[in-house]
Regions:
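Helix-loop element at the rim of GNAT/NAT acetyltransferase active sites that forms part
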Residues: 11, 30-47, 62-63
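Conserved catalytic-core motifs of GNAT/GCN5-like acyltransferases
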Residues: 134-137, 149-169
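Terminal substrate-recognition subdomain of acyl/acetyltransferases
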Residues: 1-11, 168-198
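Conserved GNAT acetyl-CoA-binding A-motif
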Residues: 125-136
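Acetyl-CoA-dependent GNAT
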Residues: 48-107, 118, 179-182, 192-197
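A short beta-loop-alpha structural element at the N-terminal edge
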Residues: 15-30
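Glycine-rich phosphate/pyrophosphate-binding loop shared by adenosine-nucleotide-utilizing enzymes
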Residues: 13-15, 77-83, 171
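Conserved acetyl-CoA-binding loop-helix of GNAT-fold acetyltransferases
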Residues: 104, 110-123, 127, 146-150
């Protein structure tokens, strides 16, 4: 699905959150690799699960056409610096769910882009009768966990020793969820998974 873009002014930086279009594909392919190499908060290391320009064009086309999909980018002066994606399922038993992933270039951390992408996605999900929002986040990513709590998500469980990072140690993953029944009368289910939708 495609939504109307919105401009944000945070900490002296102006950026736009809008739906992805075909001409974004090459930039998206490049920054995805860069982001994966900048943080261990994602599931991938740099270059793993590579998606080229054509691959992103196909994803953008699908997400623009499917009612339960949403692909957003954060843009600064015509440069894409982050993106998020909601992906639904065609399976009837899973049709109420949407999986969400978000990533931002490290140099643009601290400008609320992740929050803006998440809030826009939550608003879109609520307007499209989505019932539950859930996500998975590394337990050591305390800032993200606090943000998710502020946006109405609660801890649902812990995946013990879920990820092995570069220091050779194993880290837990926190599963969080937001039930829209608590916030308004109608809705369905959205899954937020850090870095898994790409």
């Amino acid at each position: 699905m495609i939504i109307k873009g919105q401009e944000f002014h945070i900490n002296g930086l102006t950026y736009t959150v809008r739906s992805a279009v075909q001409t974004d594909a090459e930039q998206l392919s490049e920054i995805r690799v860069q982001i994966d190499g900048e943080t261990e908060n994602m599931d991938r290391e740099a270059g793993e699960g590579f998606i080229d320009k054509i691959g992103f064009q196909k994803i953008i086309k699908t997400d623009s056409e499917e009612m339960k999909n949403l692909f957003l980018v954060a843009e600064v002066h015509n440069r894409i610096v982050g993106f998020s994606r909601c992906e639904g399922s065609n399976l009837k038993r899973l049709s109420h769910k949407i999986e969400f992933g978000v990533c931002i270039l490290r140099e643009f951390w601290g400008y609320g882009m992740g929050k803006s992408l998440l809030q826009q996605s939550i608003q879109w999900a609520d307007e499209n009768e989505v019932k539950k929002i859930s996500l998975q986040v590394l337990e050591k990513n305390e800032k993200a966990i606090q943000l998710y709590k502020k946006l109405g998500l609660e801890v649902e469980g812990i995946l013990k020793n879920d990820k092995k990072l570069s220091d050779g140690k194993y880290y837990n993953t926190v599963v969080m969820g937001r039930f829209t029944d608590t916030f308004h009368k109608r809705g369905e289910e959205v899954c937020f998974t850090e870095g898994n939708t790409m």
